[in-house]
Amino acid sequence: EEQNISEDIEFDNLDHLCNHFMIYKKREAIATARVREKENHIFKIERVAVLVEHRNIKVGSLLINEIIKYYNETENKSSIILHSQVAVEKFYKSLNFVSYGENFLEDGILHIAMRHIN
């Protein structure tokens, strides 16, 4: 709802191909993301969301760092990528992601492609 993305885009029939990560607080999901293998062991973090009241207290950082840790320890990955909204690019840069390419529109929102650097 917050991003005003239509359900047709949000429910893309790819969930069954993804690993899903969640952070709970007292049985309430407060953060989530999914990761999908694109090709050649390239994993893309998608659908990152943190409830508004839990932002700016490192929940998002914890979620992304745990995802990176999981793929570093369990998968023969060549790269972890994501499409960051330009508004939060600085957040991902703080977690060792670097931007590449030009800004682009995805679902009507300005994004930049990013890659994690170990």
Predicted regions and their residues:
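Conserved beta-strand in the GNAT
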Residues: 22, 28-37, 41-49
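Conserved catalytic-core motifs of GNAT/GCN5-like acyltransferases
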Residues: 81-83, 93, 98-113
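Short loop/turn motifs at secondary-structure junctions and domain boundaries
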Residues: 11-16
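Helix-loop element at the rim of GNAT/NAT acetyltransferase active sites that forms part
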Residues: 1-7
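Conserved GNAT acetyl-CoA-binding A-motif
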Residues: 64, 71-84
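Conserved acetyl-CoA-binding loop-helix of GNAT-fold acetyltransferases
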Residues: 50, 56-69
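Residue-level recognition of the GNAT/N-acetyltransferase active site
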Residues: 51, 85
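A conserved beta-turn-beta hairpin within the catalytic core of GNAT-like acetyltransferases
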Residues: 37-45, 55, 74-76, 105-111
